[in-house]
């Protein structure tokens, strides 16, 4: 009888240990499925870039954006094939692309955004005022300028400079454009520049890369002034790096090295697209920086 009891106790103990181990394996599997991975899953042979299919000057599915060109540069340096995973850059973009392991890097990602882990920044720019040459507004360099009080100024609703406009009493005559759109069908930047060319607004405020790109395409070209002299409201200049998954530490370090080693080539690509680049002292970075060796 005692022997039988001992055997049963031993069996119960073994079952308990097996259940504990199985529970740990299940928990580990569930953790992995939720994205909390302990290993990096970066494709070793293909540079898989998360991108928007219609969001120039950043990217499009024809490979015409500067993030497309940066992808080509990095793929060449990494000696990898290049593949773009396209998804509209709106709510859910990071979750459905990088978070779903369908790609391994977002080429443009603001510092301080906690949806992904950022690399070192590779450019710095600011929101900018866009106006016609000779309009009397092409020398305005701050939203505190009294000349804007009576002007109709375009602004993308919900962006930081909207706060600066409100502080300076410019919202009465403002024309708002939507922030959250499906980029496959609409572009607030294109609509704003179109209204500026037609005279429906006197000036517009856009994120630097968009301002520079569309101003350069206009006929005649429009004047772009980075807004770096604001003393009221939020700052309007930001650093942009690349976004990777939080677990991909080695991948982040590899991208950081590539950014450092190829900064002049990166600057040249950005300048070719009209991006108003700024150094840390808010001074413009010109084409001469793109000719210097790293």
What are these regions (language model features)?
Residues 2-11:
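Twin-arginine (Tat) signal peptide motif
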Residues 30-32, 160-181, 256-294:
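Ligand-binding clefts/hinges and TM-proximal coupling segments of bilobed small-molecule sensing domains
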Residues 31-114, 183-186, 272-273:
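Extracytoplasmic small-molecule ligand-binding "clamshell" domains
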Residues 31-32, 65-77, 134-137, 141-160, ...:
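Extended ligand-binding regions for polar small-molecule ligands
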Residues 52-53, 124-136, 216-259, 273-294:
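Periplasmic-binding protein-like
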Residues 53-57, 61-76, 129-188, 209-210:
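Bilobed "Venus flytrap"/periplasmic-binding protein-like clamshell domains
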Residues 72, 76, 81-147, 158, ...:
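Acidic, polar ligand-binding/catalytic clefts
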Residues 79-81, 99-108, 150-152, 192, ...:
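Alpha-to-beta junction loops
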């Amino acid at each position: 009888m005692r022997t039988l009891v001992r055997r049963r106790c031993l069996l119960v103990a073994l079952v308990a240990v097996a259940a504990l181990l199985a529970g740990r394996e299940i928990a580990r599997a569930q953790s992995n499925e939720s994205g909390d991975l302990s290993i990096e899953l970066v494709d070793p042979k293909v540079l898989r870039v998360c991108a928007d299919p219609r969001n120039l000057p950043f990217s499009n599915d024809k490979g015409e954006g500067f993030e497309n060109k940066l992808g080509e540069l990095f793929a060449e340096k990494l000696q990898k094939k290049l593949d773009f995973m396209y998804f509209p850059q709106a709510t859910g973009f990071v979750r459905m692309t990088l978070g779903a392991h369908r790609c391994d890097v977002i080429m443009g990602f603001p510092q301080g955004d906690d949806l992904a882990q950022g690399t070192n920044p590779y450019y710095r720019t600011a929101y900018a005022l866009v106006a016609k040459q000779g309009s009397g507004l092409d020398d305005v360099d701050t939203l505190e300028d009294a000349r804007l009080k009576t002007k109709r100024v375009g602004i993308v609703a919900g962006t930081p400079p909207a706060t600066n406009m409100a502080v300076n009493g410019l919202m009465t005559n403002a024309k708002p454009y939507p922030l959250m759109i499906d980029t496959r069908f609409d572009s607030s930047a294109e609509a704003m520049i179109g209204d500026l060319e037609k005279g429906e607004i006197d000036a517009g405020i856009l994120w630097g890369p968009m301002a520079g790109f569309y101003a350069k395409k206009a006929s005649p070209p429009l004047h772009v002034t980075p807004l770096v002299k604001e003393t009221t409201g939020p700052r309007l200049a930001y650093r942009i790096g690349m976004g990777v998954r939080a677990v991909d530490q080695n991948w982040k370090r590899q991208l950081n090295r590539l950014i450092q080693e190829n900064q002049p080539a990166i600057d040249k690509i950005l300048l070719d697209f009209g991006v108003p680049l700024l150094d840390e002292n808010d001074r413009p970075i010109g084409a001469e920086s793109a000719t210097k060796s790293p």
